[in-house]
């Protein structure tokens, strides 16, 4: 998944950018995930609001916008800035940690460690490459590329390459590009591919070759350019669209490919399509109906609250049907 949300280009872009910056600060510096989620939810709701927000009171009528966030919106609308953010930006340690976490492979803990050692900028990282692991070096190498959003038009071209090459390896493979792209987003942060094969189930032995054969094919056609990590069920790497007729080079992009057992595939597709907030709402509804859902299975809950055996699932719609919830197309899941 992408490291950072791009600035919003909406009616209330200033407000959503402010909330996203606060969210990143809470996650990366304070490691306060509940506050991170609260700011993100508010930003997501406001991004879809069809009118220009004129006050915190107006924003507060929206789900997920509480009193404290409404007060921050009032301050931002009145002054064009937020004292809390100004303070964060002026604090060298906070701003440096926040910045370094934008490098793929550098999480909040690693960023804090680097800052404690006086490593605060890209230039500092380049001078201290011996202190970086393989993933972080690749993240540094392609930092500028990874910062760029991927336009939907490019994502569609990337999808065409992946799906066609997968079928060349074996026509029985099933692959789905998930994330915000599947929900119809105009741009994406990275490419998230789920992969399965009828011969691989949760009962069968591990079959890493099913994943590795696909990765090797995508390397052979020079779509995958770098490997960050390659396990038995997950590949993390870098890809690039081929340039046409000596046109300018396309940026390098992050790609993850996950191999999922066939019987767990559609629970995985549902989970990795998102959005996070939609998934939380769906899980809450499932619990009310006596089921528990995660990225692997849907299981009934007994009277004692203990989950039973996984239920058979052959499509996303099956999961909606079990919990008696009206099916929603991926484009309607961006909550």
Curated annotation (Swiss-Prot):
Q: What is its main location?
A: nucleus
Q: Where in the cell is it found?
A: Nucleus; Cytoplasm
Q: Which residues bind Na(+) 2?
A: 101, 103, 106
This chain's protein is named DNA polymerase beta
List the active site.
72
**Annotated InterPro entries:** DNA-dir_DNA_pol_X, DNA_pol-X_BS, DNA_pol_b-like_N, DNA_pol_B_palm_palm, DNA_pol_lambd_fingers_domain, DNA_pol_lamdba_lyase_dom_sf, DNA_Pol_thumb_sf, DNA_pol_X
**Entry binding sites for K(+) 2:** 101, 103, 106
List required co-factors. Mg(2+)
Name positions with the PTM Omega-N-methylarginine: 83, 152
Q: Which reaction does it catalyse?
A: DNA(n) + a 2'-deoxyribonucleoside 5'-triphosphate = DNA(n+1) + diphosphate; a 5'-end 2'-deoxyribose-2'-deoxyribonucleotide-DNA = (2E,4S)-4-hydroxypenten-2-al-5-phosphate + a 5'-end 5'-phospho-2'-deoxyribonucleoside-DNA + H(+); 2'-deoxyribonucleotide-(2'-deoxyribose 5'-phosphate)-2'-deoxyribonucleotide-DNA = a 3'-end 2'-deoxyribonucleotide-(2,3-dehydro-2,3-deoxyribose 5'-phosphate)-DNA + a 5'-end 5'-phospho-2'-deoxyribonucleoside-DNA + H(+)
Sites where N6-acetyllysine occurs are at 72
GO BP: any one term = DNA damage response
Q: Which UniProt keywords apply?
A: Acetylation, Cytoplasm, DNA damage, DNA repair, DNA replication, DNA synthesis, DNA-binding, DNA-directed DNA polymerase, Isopeptide bond, Lyase, Magnesium, Metal-binding, Methylation, Nucleotidyltransferase, Nucleus, Potassium, Sodium, Transferase, Ubl conjugation
Chain residues that bind Na(+) 1: 60, 62, 65
Cofactor binding comment, as recorded: Binds 2 magnesium ions per subunit.
Q: Where does Mg(2+) 1 bind?
A: 190, 192
Q: What does the record list as coiled-coil region(s)?
A: none
Q: Give the organism the record lists.
A: Bos taurus (Bovine)
The gene for this chain is: POLB
Which Gene3D superfamilies does UniProt cross-reference here? 5' to 3' exonuclease, C-terminal subdomain, Beta Polymerase, domain 2, DNA polymerase beta, N-terminal domain-like, DNA polymerase, thumb domain
Region feature DNA-binding, mapped onto this chain: 183-192
Amino-acid positions noted as binding a 2'-deoxyribonucleoside 5'-triphosphate in the UniProt annotation, renumbered to this chain? 149, 180, 183, 189-190
């Amino acid at each position: 998944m992408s490291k950072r949300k791009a600035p919003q280009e909406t009616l209330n872009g200033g407000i959503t950018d402010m909330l996203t910056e606060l969210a990143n600060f809470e996650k990366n510096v304070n490691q306060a995930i509940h506050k991170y989620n609260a700011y993100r939810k508010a930003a997501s709701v406001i991004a879809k609001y069809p009118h220009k927000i004129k006050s915190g009171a107006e924003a507060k009528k929206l789900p997920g916008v509480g009193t404290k966030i409404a007060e921050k919106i009032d301050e931002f609308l009145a002054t064009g800035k937020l004292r809390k953010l100004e303070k964060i930006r002026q604090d060298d340690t906070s701003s440096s940690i926040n910045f370094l976490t934008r490098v793929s492979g550098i999480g909040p803990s690693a960023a804090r460690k680097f800052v404690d050692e006086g490593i605060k900028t890209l230039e500092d990282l380049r001078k201290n490459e011996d202190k970086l692991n393989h993933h972080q070096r690749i993240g540094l190498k392609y930092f500028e590329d990874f910062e760029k959003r991927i336009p939907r038009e490019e994502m569609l071209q990337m999808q065409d390459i992946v799906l066609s090459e997968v079928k060349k390896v074996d026509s029985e493979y099933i692959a789905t590009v998930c994330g915000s792209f599947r929900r119809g987003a105009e741009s994406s942060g990275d490419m998230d591919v789920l992969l399965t094969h009828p011969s691989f189930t949760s009962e069968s032995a591990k079959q890493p070759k099913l994943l590795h054969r696909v990765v090797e094919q995508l390397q052979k056609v020079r779509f995958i350019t770098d490997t960050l990590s390659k396990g038995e069920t997950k590949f993390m790497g870098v890809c690039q669209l081929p340039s046409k007729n000596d046109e300018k080079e396309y940026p390098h992009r992050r790609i993850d490919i996950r191999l999922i057992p066939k019987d767990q595939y559609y629970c995985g597709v549902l989970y990795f399509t998102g959005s996070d907030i939609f998934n939380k709402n769906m899980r809450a509804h499932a619990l009310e109906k006596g089921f528990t859902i995660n990225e692997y299975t849907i299981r009934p809950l007994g009277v004692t609250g203990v989950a039973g055996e996984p239920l058979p699932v052959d499509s996303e719609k099956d999961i909606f049907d079990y919990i008696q919830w009206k099916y929603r197309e991926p484009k309607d899941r961006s909550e």
